[in-house]
Amino acid sequence: MNTNLKNLTTMLVALVMLTGAGAAAQDAAEIMEQSHLAYYYAADDGVAEVTMTITDKRGKERTKEFVMLRMDESDGGPQKYYTYFRKPSDISRLTFMVHKIPDGNDMRWIYIPSVDLVKPIAADDKNSSFVGSHFSYEDVSGRHWSEDTHELVGDSTIGESPVWVIKSVPKEKYKGFATKLSYVDKDSYLPLLESYYDKKDKLVRVFRAEQIEVIDDIVTMTVRSMENVKKGGKTTIEFSDISYDTGLDESIFTERYLRNPPRKYIK
């Protein structure tokens, strides 16, 4: 093979390898986008009763009950969440609201009825515990897929479900994790398992989809859990009485309704 032909062959091989790597990265990002939409953007809005069971490292359990309302402006775009706590008595009537802004800092507020106070939650508090659970505030309302780089690292199965295995790394400094492995169902695009690692590559937390049902023709995760491997303990969240496309009024997601919950949905 002459030198010119050899050089051309080398260039073509390199181009194919680069193109393949770019396509794989693009595919991984697309998978994570679809997963985010399937998990956090089902229908245009949603209402559900929620039971949260918090188990500490000694096995002691606490249960909290609340109602969650969600409204989307567009798929992958701004969202609004409203959460009203029923039980236990020490947090009864506490409300929590999020205005998610994909390209900016989310806005979060909490209403504390015991002191009649609406308190903004700082953007850097998004990784703190959501009402004492093993889920963070951001776990509840979602971390946007565009904030991380994604790599398709393989295929596997969870139970009988074939999944993609995606490695995600934050684009900017982030307290939540250094690396995350997501096991995304190839049929529903829901994340069936997520493993969170710190900067020393130590496993810190594990998220699991415990139960999935079809509700109003939408594949829905009705039971999910988060285990803190590093510190111990686990929180399980169960959704019931789920309704989609209810026609929620946008005015619900304002400070007025933090103090005065919408009785149509909070009975």
Located regions from the model:
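Bacterial N-terminal signal peptides that target proteins for export
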Residues: 1-12
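Hydrophobic alpha-helical targeting segments used for export or membrane insertion
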Residues: 13-18
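Sec/Tat signal peptide C-region and signal peptidase I cleavage site
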Residues: 21-25
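Ribonuclease/tRNase effector modules and their secretory precursors
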Residues: 26-27, 51-53, 62-68, 75-77, ...
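N-terminal mature ectodomain segment of secretory-pathway/periplasmic proteins
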Residues: 28-114
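Gly/Pro-enriched, hydrophobic low-complexity segments
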Residues: 33, 86, 97-99, 107-111, ...
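Short, low-complexity, Pro/Ser/Thr/Gly-rich segments in the mature regions of secreted, periplasmic
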Residues: 254-267
